[in-house]
């Protein structure tokens, strides 16, 4: 049965990772998003999905049947590895192959709590399982701009500020892409940081919304990047992906047969 509303308080990528749970719960008549800018960016992409009605900005989800505010509780409890599965748990769907790992809580019963948020694990719908190979972003026309689309943010790269002696990304070498037709999607400052760090200049691509981002990624042969909204879109389409992950916080591990959490010349050439 179609949900009477879904509400989310988080950022672009988190909302994209929530969509399999929305799909398995029967879709929704409307999806409300707390952040206005995030809402406007995502609206064309989300409304293109057959299981989502309208998308709108709202400061609260009081009238929504499914509220993902408790998603933050799972994140803080260190249920890490895949954000899609974390949303499935929030929606009362047991992710059978999600390793439920809790490092900051002694789980005495099938019940989680964090602050004023409570999640009853007994409500899981065991018959609902999401296939790792099933795309949840569809109805997207490919738009070819470059063979390889790159998007990285400075997320986890501020290692000096975090008191770390080592940068746990050093083994991921973006320069392996430099001899190919590459485009970079992202903010101006992200592009400049990339150029300064890796010493080559892919074409800079500006986009108007998430739907255009999806079209450009789908029109490419390969997506290369880190934990970002563009990576979430690539994951939602099950597009070939080489992903730079944090060994400390591996939140967005690719979960399909064309997703890799390392880069090599052989993989770049293969795609």
Segments and roles (model prediction):
Residues 1-271:
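Catalytic machinery of carbohydrate-active enzymes
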């Amino acid at each position: 049965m179609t949900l009477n509303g879904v509400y989310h308080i988080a950022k672009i990528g988190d909302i994209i990772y929530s969509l399999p749970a929305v799909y398995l719960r029967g879709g929704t008549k409307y999806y409300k998003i707390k952040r206005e800018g995030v809402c406007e960016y995502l609206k064309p992409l989300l409304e293109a999905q057959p299981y989502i009605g309208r998308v709108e900005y709202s400061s609260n989800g009081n009238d929504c049947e499914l509220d993902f505010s408790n998603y933050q509780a799972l994140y803080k409890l260190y249920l890490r590895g895949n954000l899609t599965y974390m949303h499935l748990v929030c929606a009362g769907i047991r992710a059978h192959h999600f390793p439920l790992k809790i490092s900051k809580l002694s789980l005495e019963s099938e019940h989680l709590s964090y602050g004023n948020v409570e999640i009853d694990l007994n409500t899981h719908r065991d018959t609902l399982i999401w296939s790792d190979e099933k795309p949840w972003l569809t109805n997207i026309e490919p738009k070819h701009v470059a063979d390889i689309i790159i998007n990285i943010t400075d997320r986890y790269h501020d290692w000096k500020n975090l008191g770390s002696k080592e940068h746990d990304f050093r083994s991921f070498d973006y320069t392996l892409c430099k001899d190919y037709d590459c485009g970079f999607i992202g903010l101006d400052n992200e592009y400049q940081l990339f150029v300064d760090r890796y010493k080559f200049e892919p074409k800079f691509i500006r986009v108007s919304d998430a739907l255009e981002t999806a079209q450009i990624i789908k029109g490419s042969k390969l997506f290369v990047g880190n934990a970002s909204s563009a990576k979430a879109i690539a994951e939602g389409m099950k597009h070939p992906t080489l992903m730079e992950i944090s060994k400390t916080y591996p939140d967005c591990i690719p979960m399909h047969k064309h997703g890799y959490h390392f880069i090599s010349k052989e993989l770049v050439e293969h795609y």
